[in-house]
Amino acid sequence: MSGIKNIKKKLKGFQVRPPNAEVIKKVLLHIPYVVVFYVVNKCTWLYQYCRGSTVVDRLMVLLMNYPLAFKKLLPSIQPKSLAVGTIAAVSVWAVVYFKGKNGKKFRQGEEYGSARWGNEKDIAPFIDPVFENNILLTQTERLTMNSRPKKPKYARNKNVIVIGGSGSGKTRFYVKPQLMQMPDNVSFVVTDPKGTIIVECGKMLARGTPKKDKNGKILRDKNGRVVMAPYKIKVLNTINFAKSMHYNPFHYIRSEKDILKLVNTIMVNTKGEGEKSSEDFWTKAERLLYCALIGYIYYEAPEEEQNFSTLLEFINASETREEDEEFKNAVDLLFEELERDEPNHFAVRQYKKYKLAAGKTAKSILISCGARLAPFDIAELREIMSYDEMELDMVGDQRTALFIIISDTDDTFNFVVAMMYSQLFNLLCDRADDVHHGRLPYHVRILADEFANIGQIPKFDKLIATIRSREISASIILQSQSQLKTIYKDAAETITGNCDTMLFLGGKESTTLKEISETLGKETIDLYNTSDTRGQSRSYGLNYQKTGKELMSRDELAVMDGNKCILQLRGVRPFYSDKFDITKHKRYKQLSDYDKKNEFHVEEYMKHQMEVRLDPEEQFDLYMYESSELEEQSNNENEGTGHVT
């Protein structure tokens, strides 16, 4: 038996591989020349045996008896026959070659452009057979969530730029359909202007979808009930802090580079109206102070004090006196003590650079810091940023739906949102690289509605170019393309260039209309000109010609039907389609749009989560002190201890 197996292996090793398509194409192209050689070769052989007084007579005999030349299938090997056959084949090849090289290139019907609308056949290779595993773009077009399709030429990144004026349905026709899909291994981060999306879709996400095993079979418990896989819902509410979970940026600092990133985000998103590039000295000085103080808090303060409240206390305690350069405040003394223990400490090195400023200059820097961090004077903001419940670093490890609620009229607290997004991108990329070998187990979809209102995310143009490989994608939702240029300036082109998909829902902003019209291209149309000349003898004329026309001009885009949209996918013809109708989705009945009973109540959910965290069976140590005992705490060893059950 072992001998038979070895023979089979050897036979497999000698299997002939199928020829390459390019090789087959070249062979087929040369077959006509082989036929010419063969026919001329055989006729030349027969011509030598034809009798006649002239060449014409011999050719006539050849034509009358040409079947005799092919009685033997093999070509003649006589030198004369081989030479004439070769010359004939080469001559035909030369004629074809030079005719093709010098010939005119006609593209009938495409003289002025070949633009056209895409159809079902064009989008078919990009659609996943499992409906839930698609990004819903229009009523008829979808894009698979699979980042590695069988044919690499159909691979597209999942970054989408959605453009639509006010009232065009960006939330209804794009954001909600994505949430209704609820794919198995996808988490969502949603910017929610006014906080309506979480109310309308939260209950559906909290319920989740049926849990499946590795074979795709729905799991059931011992009672036969379907086991559900709900989304873990997180909420940051910058409109009503009472309805927000806690977010502490200090919780996600892992190293000195994270301190620098956090400081940079604060500086970029809290610029005053009068802050200009000419005042660069002051911003750099502020940056040094922030790095020093945050570095001290991160490395030296207990975990419960690592927050913005402590940072404000440091700044408030940083008193300076113009008339007394030798004066040392409480913060100076803390850093001097730290320097004695660790002279090369990151915070110490930053603080020493800051202290190079004279008393008057330092006072101006502190005033700038106080003005920049003025929003933290609000007790509610300090409270929600006192500790962390967001688990930003775990969004790519578990089914999560993070809602970031922002005001569409007031940007006072948008710097907090920009801070969160900046940390989120960095945390997810680092976790993908360090823990999951480059790819997160859960694809993180960021649905950034009203993207222009969340502030500036540092180096976003570089992030969007690299997040694809880590299973992260961003949907940038704008009212016009000019909004992106206003915030990101020259980097706006890079950002749009890294979005393989563009969805236009309607609008009237001229720059946007112009760019979309140019991108759609031109088609070739037929043009008829008629003339009617009246005089002594009346004459009519009809002139036919071709001309070019935009597939959709700016004025046509401006008056586009409200139910229509335009989809552009890289490498595919554009689509003019109906917007997605959420009422036809199988999960529409789980939204509050269908039934008000489906409204999601954030406070109740947060209360329930708190009750889950506080297990009633868990025991805690309770220490009780009298005032006299507090005074003698260092010497008193008799502490009262109780148990809470």
What are these regions (language model features)?
Residues 143-149, 271-281, 527-545:
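Low-complexity, polar-biased intrinsically disordered regions enriched in Pro/Ser/Thr/Gly
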Residues 121-125, 415, 451, 507:
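A short glycine-/small-residue-rich loop at the edge of a beta-strand within enzyme catalytic domains
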Residues 1-168, 172-178, 214-222, 522, ...:
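Basic- and hydrophobic-enriched, low-structure N-terminal and domain-boundary segments
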Residues 464-566:
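Conserved ATP-driven motor cores of ASCE-family P-loop NTPases powering translocation/secretion/packaging/pilus
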Residues 131-137, 415-422, 516:
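Conserved long hydrophobic alpha-helices within structured protein cores
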Residues 65, 69, 75, 111, ...:
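Intrinsically disordered, low-complexity N-terminal regions enriched in serine/proline/glycine
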Residues 115, 142, 146, 158-159, ...:
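General secondary-structure edge motif
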Residues 2-7, 26, 30, 38-42, ...:
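P-loop NTPase motor domains
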